[in-house]
From Swiss-Prot:
Residue ranges, compositional bias (Basic and acidic residues): 332-344
Quaternary structure (record): Homodimer. Forms heterodimers with BCAR1/p130cas. Forms complexes with PTK2B/RAFTK, adapter protein CRKL and LYN kinase. Part of a complex composed of NEDD9, AURKA and CTTN; within the complex NEDD9 acts as a scaffold protein and is required for complex formation. Part of a ternary complex composed of SMAD3, ITCH/AIP4 and NEDD9/HEF1; within the complex NEDD9/HEF1 interacts (via N-terminus) with ITCH/AIP4 (via WW domains); the complex mediates ubiquitination and proteasomal degradation of NEDD9/HEF1.
Region annotation (Interacts with CTTN) ranges: 351-834
Sequence positions bearing Phosphoserine: 296, 369, 780
Listed GO MF terms: protein tyrosine kinase binding
Domain called SH3: residue spans: 3-65
Predominant location: cytoplasm
Organism for this UniProt entry: Homo sapiens (Human)
Protein name as it appears in the record: Enhancer of filamentation 1
GO terms for cellular component: basolateral plasma membrane; cell cortex; ciliary basal body; cytoplasm; cytosol; focal adhesion; Golgi apparatus; immunological synapse
Length: 834
């Protein structure tokens, strides 16, 4: 399966960590060449400003959906396309099994390598035009006048004298497709190697069929994925992603490799009371208090064997040992020691109020563990009667704070805003001119009700997240941002209050058709009209508030203490919690809620007596939980300073180059403006011929000859200005300048060429010879049509930037304009001298 080139927008800035990774800024538009390239899950091969490299897929967002294409007979291997074009190697296409061939026998052309592997039936012709199928773009680039369009880079012609010609690269085999070489020695992709000197398909000679039937290559051929790729797939993932190793107790062998998912292993099958104990302890987020759940534990519950389940369960869960566990009730205190509570999943114990250091440490761990838990469950858990830290909670503003890194917060906010806009759009799609009539309401009453409920739900989720961001702003030293966000939030809250009230009133009347259907126009608005009018204003207010939060995300959002910032963190956090209707809420953390608020996975069993940490010692807790996160690479100070120095030096070099480029562009702009402002002279009385033109015995009158010579000189001057403008435009395209730059240069090209059109129109009105008038008019009209084409091509190149196809089309049209302008100038000279 392959994908066509897609466009993707960068959601965040990306600083490359290796030579193959691509650097980009937030908002850049990248061309996605391949997803999950080279078997690297989550890494995409992209192109930006003429450079290619791999980028993390969770840092970009596709602008359009993926379009799959199957390997048809019209598709050719990328590495062999230009070789086939220039006759250096002949590759054969496998017919598409979905293409309904004329008969059941595949027709294969003879091999030009004379290997004799494929035997072709003698009765079938092998005409070359039937064998090779060259894409239309390549045919035009070779035989047409538009010039080559090779690879994914924009090719600009080179100016030679008063014209432009395309220069073909010297070696197409290496420079056609700008794709990094494969790191594997075997063919993983469904593309024959371009440098193969032998037969295309590696089929053993012993399997040749003399019947002339196409022999499908075995699984060991080029098209098969080598076993090493499948075998090393897990190894590749572990090298590319920083997955934590499973936690194992010292001295315990790795009895069985448990799965990656957070599901307790099924090696032990409890029955009876054991099963009851398991379900009472394994279900996180149960509504009953913790003390009540402990009462259901059987005091005679035997602990699992040390070598059977505990070791495997410890392998399945990677949770710090520093997290303390709840003690059982007083009646089961004889079983409260850690060694007899192995296998019982429990909720972490509160830290005593006087142990401040240990409490802060466990709070940090809890924030890390709870960062993906739903906020609805968090709000419900605030009434837990077993929490002793509720009296120690901070101010209300701090209770609602969002402890997220900026990238995760921005992505989550964008999803909420998009869901809100989609909900309002679906409601507006149902509102028509006669949508309140009885017939329409009878058909669409359920759809309207669903759309109203979705708008209210999405707005509620959006407000839930935004309030947390406003709470973060309240903790900043400067309150200017907080006051601004509070004003913008107030508008959205007012709208939400109106929508909630009107929705409640609509539910009170049970959405009765007799009440909602209106056959006559009336001046009074009912609840449904009021809901629609207010819902229209919500996306604009939400967009303004979202823009404010995105702009100040670095100041508003910071990870909480103890949280980890991984490169693929945003994707993993966003996918950890799902909400109805596609919404996702931000996690609001309450310092006193971490007891009743359970994990999405069961907690590990208590540690054995030899390995159980001292719950009364905060120092031991600090030491133990740090050991469990030793897989996190902490960058040293020297390495960090060295990288920062390199980045600063690179940034300074880029700034200097940018300043030099901007200075050159500014001077070029000024020169072009001076040339453009020069008008076309119409006063022939002040004109003196620059050179003596040869006279002939043709029927051209002296007055027409003088006019042709006069405007030929004018055309020569403005033609040079046109070439200078084209040079500036091609320079912008070659340096990958944005649309605002090359569009401005294209205007100079159009204005310069328009002066030539003006000269042609003036000559058409002033010359007396009919044949000369017709020739000048035809040439002038051709230039005018070419200008219209350039305007459209420039517009498409700007709209589809950075599409190389659109840019290349603009370059082709401008090149054609230079040729037509040169022909127009030459025709004036010919008509004046012959």
């Amino acid at each position: 399966m392959k994908y066509k080139n897609l466009m993707a927008r960068a959601l965040y800035d990306n600083v490359p960590e290796c030579a193959e990774e691509l650097a980009f800024r937030k908002g850049d538009i990248l061309t996605v060449i391949e997803q999950n390239t080279g078997g690297l899950e989550g890494w995409w091969l992209c192109s930006l400003h003429g450079r290619q490299g791999i980028v993390p897929g969770n840092r970009v967002k596709l602008l359009i959906g993926p379009m799959q294409e199957t390997a048809s007979s019209h598709e050719q291997p990328a590495s062999g396309l230009m070789q086939q074009t220039f006759g250096q190697q002949k590759l054969y296409q496998v017919p598409n099994p979905q293409a309904a061939p004329r008969d059941t026998i595949y027709q294969v052309p003879p091999s030009y390598q004379n290997q004799g592997i494929y035997q072709v039936p003698t009765g079938h012709g092998t005409q070359e035009q039937e064998v090779y199928q060259v894409p239309p773009s390549v045919q035009r680039s070779i035989g047409g006048t538009s010039g080559p369009h090779v690879g994914k880079k924009v090719i600009t012609p080179v100016r030679t004298g008063h014209g432009y010609v395309y220069e073909y690269p010297s070696r197409y085999q290496k420079d056609v497709y700008d794709i990094p070489p494969s790191h594997t020695t075997q063919g993983v992709y469904d593309i024959p190697p371009s440098s193969a000197k032998g037969p295309v398909f590696s089929v053993p000679v012993g399997e040749i069929k003399p019947q002339g039937v196409y022999d499908i290559p075995p699984t060991k051929g080029v098209y098969a994925i080598p076993p090493s790729a499948c075998r090393d797939e897990a190894g590749l993932r572990e090298k590319d992603y920083d997955f934590p190793p499973p936690m194992r107790q010292a001295g315990r062998p790795d009895l069985r490799p448990e799965g990656v998912y957070d599901i307790p292993p099924t090696c032990t099958k409890p029955a009876g009371k054991d099963l009851h104990v398991k379900y009472n302890c394994d279900i996180p987020g149960a509504a009953e208090p913790v003390a009540r759940r402990h009462q259901s534990l059987s005091p005679n519950h035997p602990p699992p064997q040390l070598g059977q389940s505990v070791g495997s369960q410890n392998d399945a869960y990677d949770v710090p040992r520093g997290v303390q566990f709840l003690e059982p009730p007083a009646e089961t205190s004889e079983k409260a020691n850690p060694q007899e509570r192995d296998g019982v999943y429990d909720v972490p114990l509160h830290n005593p109020p006087d142990a401040k250091g240990s409490r802060d440490l466990v709070d940090g761990i809890n924030r890390l563990s709870f960062s993906s838990t739903g906020s609805t469950r968090s709000n419900m858990s605030t009434s837990s009667t077993s929490s002793k830290e509720s009296s120690l909670s901070a101010s209300p503003a701090q209770d609602k704070r969002l402890f997220l890194d900026p990238d995760t917060a921005i992505e989550r906010l964008q999803r909420l805003q998009q869901a809100l806009e989609m909900g309002v759009s679906s409601l507006m799609a149902l509102v028509t001119t006669d949508w309140r009539c009885y017939g329409y309401m009878e058909r669409h009453i359920n759809e309207i009700r669903t759309a109203v409920d979705k708008v209210e739900l999405f707005l509620k989720e959006y407000l839930h997240f935004v309030k947390g961001a406003v709470a973060n702003a309240a903790c900043l030293p400067e309150l200017i941002l907080h006051n601004k966000m509070k004003r913008e939030l107030q508008r959205v809250e007012d709208s939400h209050q109106i929508l909630s009230q009107t929705s409640h009133d609509l539910n009170e009347c049970s959405w009765s058709l007799n009440i909602l259907a209106i056959n006559k126009p009336q001046n009074k608005c009912d609840d449904l009209d009021r809901f629609v009018m207010v819902a229209k204003t919500v996306p604009d207010d939400a967009k303004q508030l979202t823009t404010t939060i995105n702009t100040n995300a670095e100041a508003l959002f910071r990870p909480g203490p103890g949280s980890l910032h991984l490169k693929n963190g945003p994707e993993s956090i966003m996918n950890s919690t799902e909400y109805p209707h596609g919404g996702s809420q931000g996690q609001l953390l309450h310092p006193g809620d971490h007891k009743a608020q359970a994990h999405n996975k069961a907690l590990p069993p208590g540690l054995s007596k030899e390995q159980a940490p001292d719950c009364s010692s905060s120092d031991g807790s600090e030491r133990s939980w740090m050991d469990d996160y030793d897989y996190v690479h902490l960058q040293g100070k020297e390495e960090f300073e060295r990288q920062q120095k390199e980045l600063l030096e690179k940034e300074n070099i880029m700034k200097q180059n940018k300043m030099q480029l901007e200075h050159h562009q500014l001077s070029q702009f000024q020169l072009l403006e001076q040339e453009i402002t020069k008008p076309v002279e119409n006063d022939i009385s002040k004109w003196k011929p620059s050179q003596s033109l040869p006279t002939t015995n043709s029927g051209v009158s002296a007055q027409d000859r003088q006019l042709l010579c006069f405007y030929y000189d004018q055309c020569e001057t403005h033609f040079i200005s046109l070439l200078n403008a084209i040079d500036a435009l091609f320079s912008c395209v070659s340096s990958a300048q944005p649309p605002r730059i090359f569009v401005a240069h294209s205007k100079f090209v159009i204005l310069s060429a328009h002066k030539l059109v003006f000269i042609g129109d003036t000559l058409t009105r002033q010359v007396t010879a009919q044949d000369i008038r017709n020739k000048v008019m035809n040439s002038s009209n051709q230039l005018c049509e070419q200008l219209k084409t350039i305007v459209m091509a420039t517009k498409m190149a700007a709209l589809h930037y950075p599409s190389t196809t659109a840019l290349q089309e603009m370059v082709h049209q401008v090149t054609d304009l230079s040729r037509n302008a040169q022909l127009f100038k030459r025709s004036l000279l010919e008509m004046a001298t012959f």
